[in-house]
């Protein structure tokens, strides 16, 4: 085997190693996990809303916006529309 044969062999070994590494990672992540009793107790008796479809709305303060109205205060021209 010349230089090309060794390079091809190293490439095949590296590719197989990568495939094995990915398969081990997939199998480790798909293994069923058993929740600990502490996590179940905390979830059950936390008193919070555990609804997965609950959407919290962002609270926007009422009143003038000082960040975006900085230039309007210093200049005496009306804002462009």
Curated annotation (Swiss-Prot):
Keyword Secreted on entry: yes
GO CC annotation: apoplast
Presence of keyword Transcription regulation: no
Protein's name in the database: CLAVATA3/ESR (CLE)-related protein 25
Region Disordered, annotated ranges: 57-81
Chain positions found as Hydroxyproline: 61, 64
Glycosylation sites noted in the Swiss-Prot or TrEMBL record: 64
Source domain of life: Eukaryota
Biased composition (Basic and acidic residues): 67-81
GO molecular function term, any single one: receptor serine/threonine kinase binding
Entries under InterPro entries matching the protein: CLE25/26
Organism: Arabidopsis thaliana (Mouse-ear cress)
Transmembrane segments: none
UniProt entry keywords in alphabetical sequence: Developmental protein, Differentiation, Glycoprotein, Hydroxylation, Secreted, Signal
Signal sequence coordinates: 1-30
GO biological process: cell-cell signaling involved in cell fate commitment; maintenance of root meristem identity; phloem development; positive regulation of abscisic acid biosynthetic process; positive regulation of response to water deprivation; regulation of cell differentiation
Family the entry assigns: Belongs to the CLV3/ESR signal peptide family.
